Design a protein with these regions (language model features):
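Solvent-exposed, charged helical/coil patches
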Residues: 1-42, 116-123
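Basic, amphipathic alpha-helical patches used to engage nucleic acids or provide basic targeting signals
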Residues: 18-23, 46-115
Length: 123
């Protein structure tokens, strides 16, 4: 991954914008619950560009990426991505789209628990 001070390539920013406008139902629901500090005051960004990746949701204070997966996920690419991010100190919390839609409260509790633990352990 490039150093954090480098500007993002224009195409990377544009792709993140496109992903924000074509969100899945699960992403829309979760974003409604995460935006504007609604989850315990935690600040999340959606479709956050972190080259070479774009993270579904990212909490910088906790260095936590939340990825919502459908049936197309779960392969070697996801494992390599998680490994790359973990080397940067970012934990990846993978959840299924169905979970976000059907068990929203449980998903939010898990995100809050993990984020809170990471923030507390960083002090």
């Amino acid at each position: 991954m490039p150093p954090k001070h480098r500007p993002l390539p224009a195409w990377h920013k544009q792709r993140a914008r496109e992903l924000r406008t074509t969100a899945t139902d699960a992403e829309v629901r979760l974003w409604y619950c995460l935006r504007s500090g609604r989850l315990g005051g935690l600040k999340f960004r959606r479709q956050h560009p972190l080259p070479p990746y774009i993270l579904d949701f990212y909490c910088e204070a906790a260095k936590l990426a939340v990825e919502l997966d459908g049936s197309q996920h779960g392969g070697e690419d996801d494992a390599a991505r998680a490994s790359d991010l973990e080397r940067e100190g970012i934990m990846v919390l993978r959840l299924w789209n169905d979970q976000a839609l059907k068990e929203t409260e449980a998903v939010l509790q898990e995100i809050y628990r993990v984020a809170s633990e990471r923030i507390a352990s960083d002090r």
